[in-house]
């Protein structure tokens, strides 16, 4: 599979031969959906909580006698049927949302996303991508000069200047190649990969 190699101005300078295993895989929408959904589910912290009838701070005294009042019978004010009562099936803070995805499926899903990005001309390779200092303005000007607005940049190792420069740009995300995830790949309309990062990706998928 041939990928575009861009220059500093964002113009195609040449092409680069890339691994077919990583960039020529058929797109499997069901697999990609499963991988992305599982990744998002595994990131959930499970911090929501509700109270059941046994946890409500109300008296357990019977509100009124069983018969003769004309009301429906009631045992206690914390009943889920009453206003202010407990919830019948409360959410628990230790609820487990994790979904299991086999390593082979995960790798196939990521490869399918990368292949689709390459086919849609949304993925390109750059020799090097860096800024001289940790300044948001420098990175914003660099991306504007390349005609890029919303972009995911995948680098070979963490470039501190580049990472710090990107933090105030809400449509820009800089990731080390080892931190690349399927959600980030599908979220951005454009993906830039450095040559060093591409080599590490191909090595990992051999």
UniProtKB/Swiss-Prot annotation:
SUPFAM superfamilies: Ribosomal protein L4 (SSF52166). Keywords: Ribonucleoprotein, Ribosomal protein, RNA-binding, rRNA-binding. The keyword Cell membrane does not apply. Gene3D superfamilies: 3.40.1370.10. Residues 47-94 are annotated as: Disordered. One of its GO terms (molecular function) is rRNA binding. InterPro entries: Ribosomal_uL4, Ribosomal_uL4-like, Ribosomal_uL4_dom_sf. PANTHER family: 50S RIBOSOMAL PROTEIN L4, LARGE RIBOSOMAL SUBUNIT PROTEIN UL4M. One of the primary rRNA binding proteins, this protein initially binds near the 5'-end of the 23S rRNA. It is important during the early stages of 50S assembly. It makes multiple contacts with different domains of the 23S rRNA in the assembled 50S subunit and ribosome. Forms part of the polypeptide exit tunnel. This is Large ribosomal subunit protein uL4. It comes from Azoarcus sp. (strain BH72).
């Amino acid at each position: 599979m041939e990928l575009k190699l861009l220059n500093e101005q964002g113009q195609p300078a040449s092409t680069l031969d890339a691994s077919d295993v990583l960039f020529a895989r058929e797109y499997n929408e069901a697999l990609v959906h499963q991988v992305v959904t599982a990744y998002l589910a595994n990131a959930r912290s499970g911090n929501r909580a509700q109270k059941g009838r046994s946890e409500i701070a109300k008296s357990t005294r019977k509100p009124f006698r069983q018969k003769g009042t004309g009301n429906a019978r009631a045992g206690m004010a914390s009943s889920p049927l009453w206003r202010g009562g407990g919830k019948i099936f409360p959410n628990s803070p230790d609820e487990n949302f994790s979904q299991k995805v086999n390593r082979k499926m995960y790798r196939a899903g990521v490869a399918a996303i990368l292949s689709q990005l390459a086919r849609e001309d949304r993925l390109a390779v750059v020799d090097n991508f860096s800024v001289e200092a940790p300044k948001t303005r420098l990175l914003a000007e660099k991306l504007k000069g390349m005609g890029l607005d919303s972009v995911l940049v995948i680098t070979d190792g963490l470039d501190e200047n580049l990472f710090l420069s990107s933090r105030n740009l809400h449509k820009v995300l800089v990731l080390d190649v080892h931190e690349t995830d399927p959600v980030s790949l599908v979220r951005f309309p454009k993906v830039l990969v450095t040559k060093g990062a591409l080599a590490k990706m191909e090595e990992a998928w051999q």
